[in-house]
């Protein structure tokens, strides 16, 4: 392979000139070989712009780069370690260990750019994945091998919800998981690592981090690195869980480099290739006949606007959407899941059964009626309502509070022990409220408890 030389540097985007007969292909990895600062830096080819020049994105800081530095073409795309040796380790976008525990010791490396499984190879299942979180299991149940989005603005609990899901599923489900931290806070990555360690599930999780302080190249590719590791577990015939926090930062990293790559911005300043970039990632997150990938993705919603192009593009790919609401968080109800806005393809009587379906729809009907009555209550007060509506409001307020739940990962700051509620218990509790079996209990008893039996116990102490 002939070497090339850097001819232009604009932030994270670098132009490199190669001999005309040895131009690297798009997505090839190239490496700075000149001695000094910047040596060993890996770049990924994005465009061939003619005259032997290729435009690349750096997979690290471009500090210390200068024109004229020599660059070697590896002749292949970025390769990362896969397999059981990655479990319990923290790696960066290139699959290099960053946890100071020595080399990964992998037997195999895979390219991060891979084709999605063909239509014939794909399979879907209607098995439910129990999470132990009441509101999710009831209103927007997850499918095994499905895709779930956690939508929410800043500070409504996406990461805490995700950590609780990982903890519950890792302990109860005991499969392998891959966690990709895409452009999130390093502190959260650190908290997560220690949380997994304390729960004794670290040896079942591979962690890949490209956090907020990293250049856009890392944040753009780290989701693919994590996905490649998950695909390896799937192709070995396992059921693997793939967590991404946060998919919005993946889009944002693409936006940051898009203009530097010479593309015209589209709606709201996003890259024109937004739908394609999202599709390339999401189409690979799928289940095949050999194994399944169940993915949970946190999606930041800019300014709480669900019609923003980034969350709107993500919606199309998901089987279940868990929408976190600032209004519900303001009431002090956590998890702040909006039961009227959250959806799931699994909420179908043919999949979840008639009992579950009718309970979930009954809960939504009562909450929707309460929402409609709120304006009347605000203007005229409760006394103007009919007896039937008064009963609906009382039950709705109990349901709202019963949808809250203490989390294991939040024990430190709530002071109450976490609760895992089996689906049967969840359905039994909400059915009881809808039938009026608990009309005599005060609504405070329903707040921050697990099963309905705890409500009865709590009401005796009030």
From Swiss-Prot:
GO molecular function, one term: ATP hydrolysis activity
Chief localization: membrane
Gene3D superfamilies referenced in this protein's UniProt entry, alphabetically: 2.40.10.170, Bovine Mitochondrial F1-atpase, Atp Synthase Beta Chain, Chain D, domain 3, P-loop containing nucleotide triphosphate hydrolases
EC number: 7.1.2.2
GO cellular component: plasma membrane; proton-transporting ATP synthase complex
Membrane topology: Peripheral membrane protein
Keywords, in A-Z order: ATP synthesis, ATP-binding, Cell inner membrane, Cell membrane, CF(1), Hydrogen ion transport, Ion transport, Membrane, Nucleotide-binding, Translocase, Transport
Enzyme kind, highest EC tier: translocase
InterPro entries the UniProt entry points to: AAA+_ATPase, ATP-synt_VA_C, ATP_synth_F1_bsu, ATPase_a/bsu_AS, ATPase_alpha/beta_chains, ATPase_F1/V1/A1_a/bsu_N, ATPase_F1/V1/A1_a/bsu_N_sf, ATPase_F1/V1/A1_a/bsu_nucl-bd
Reaction catalysed by this enzyme: ATP + H2O + 4 H(+)(in) = ADP + phosphate + 5 H(+)(out)
Record's subcellular location: Cell inner membrane
Residues that hold ATP according to the record: 152-159
Lineage: superkingdom: Bacteria
Oligomer and partners: F-type ATPases have 2 components, CF(1) - the catalytic core - and CF(0) - the membrane proton channel. CF(1) has five subunits: alpha(3), beta(3), gamma(1), delta(1), epsilon(1). CF(0) has three main subunits: a(1), b(2) and c(9-12). The alpha and beta chains form an alternating ring which encloses part of the gamma chain. CF(1) is attached to CF(0) by a central stalk formed by the gamma and epsilon chains, while a peripheral stalk is formed by the delta and b chains.
NCBIfam families, A to Z: atpD
Its job: Produces ATP from ADP in the presence of a proton gradient across the membrane. The catalytic sites are hosted primarily by the beta subunits.
Protein's UniProt name: ATP synthase subunit beta
């Amino acid at each position: 392979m002939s070497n090339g030389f850097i001819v232009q540097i604009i932030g994270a985007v670098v132009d490199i000139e190669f001999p005309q007969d040895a131009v690297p292909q798009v997505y090839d990895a190239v490496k700075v070989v000149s001695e000094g600062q910047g040596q060993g830096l890996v770049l990924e080819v994005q465009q061939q712009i003619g005259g032997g020049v290729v435009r690349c994105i750096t997979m690290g800081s471009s500090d210390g780069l200068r024109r004229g530095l020599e660059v070697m073409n590896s002749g292949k795309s970025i390769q990362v370690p896969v397999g059981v040796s990655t479990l319990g380790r923290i790696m960066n976008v290139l699959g290099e260990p960053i946890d100071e525990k020595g080399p990964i010791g992998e037997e195999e490396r895979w390219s991060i750019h891979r084709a999605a499984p063909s239509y014939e190879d794909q399979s879907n299942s209607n098995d439910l994945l129990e999470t132990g979180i009441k509101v999710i299991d009831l209103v927007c149940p997850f499918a095994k091998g499905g895709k779930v989005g956690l939508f929410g603005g800043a500070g409504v609990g996406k990461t805490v919800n995700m950590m609780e899901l990982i903890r519950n599923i890792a302990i109860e489900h005991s499969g392998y998981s891959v966690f990709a931290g895409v452009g999130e806070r390093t502190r959260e990555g650190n908290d997560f690592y220690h949380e997994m360690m304390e729960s004794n599930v670290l040896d079942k999780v591979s962690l890949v981090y490209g956090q907020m302080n990293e250049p856009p190249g890392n944040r753009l590719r780290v989701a693919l690195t994590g996905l490649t590791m998950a695909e390896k577990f799937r192709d070995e015939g396992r059921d693997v869980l793939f967590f991404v926090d946060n998919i919005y930062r993946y889009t944002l990293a693409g936006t940051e480099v898009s203009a530097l790559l010479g593309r015209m911005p589209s709606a709201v300043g996003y890259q024109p290739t937004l739908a394609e970039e999202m599709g390339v990632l999401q189409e690979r997150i799928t289940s095949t006949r050999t194994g399944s990938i169940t993915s949970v993705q946190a999606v930041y919603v800019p300014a709480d606007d669900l019609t923003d192009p980034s969350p709107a593009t993500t919606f199309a790919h998901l089987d279940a959407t868990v929408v976190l609401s600032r209004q519900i968080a303001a009431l002090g109800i956590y998890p702040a899941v909006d039961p009227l806005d959250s959806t799931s393809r699994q909420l179908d009587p043919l999949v979840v059964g008639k009992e579950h379906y009718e309970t979930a729809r009954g809960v939504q009907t009562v909450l929707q009626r309460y929402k409609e009555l709120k304006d009347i209550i605000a203007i005229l007060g409760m006394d103007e309502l009919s007896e039937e509506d008064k009963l609906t409001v009382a039950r709705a307020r109990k349901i709202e509070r019963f949808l809250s739940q203490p989390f294991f990962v939040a024990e430190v700051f709530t002071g109450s022990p976490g609760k895992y509620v089996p689906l049967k218990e969840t359905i039994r509790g909400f059915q009881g409220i809808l039938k009026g079996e608990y009309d005599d209990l005060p609504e405070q008893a329903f707040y921050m408890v697990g099963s309905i039996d705890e409500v009865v116990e709590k009401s005796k102490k009030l």
